[in-house]
């Protein structure tokens, strides 16, 4: 993935992969335990995302779930991609619980990335069935359930501050 946003150039020494994060997560969990029906989830990226997702979710005193970027920036949906992602989360007691996302505000819509235009309607349905069949929770990006494709929005219509500041290098969050 091409580095174009200011975030991509930051040294993330205090907000990613920091040794104090698991302890901080335990403090968050302690607060959430005071309320009913709370679900906590982490978005985890970086060089050691798999280990960190497990560390952030293992046991009963950390987050309920985590998701990474296995699918978000993949150019193609392949059986090996799905198998590799599932292999990271074997069904083992105390290991943690995954969540899965194929799309979000920082990645192009999966239907546009993974499928030719002529097959998008059927592919969007298949993609939702696949997402629902993965062991874990589903995280849907607004419009994903409808099979929405990535939209090019003219600069004049942009609302997203990051897209405006980095035009035309970055994908806007408006579409």
Where are these regions (language model features)?
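Active-site and adjacent substrate-binding regions of carbohydrate-active enzymes
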Residues: 1-175
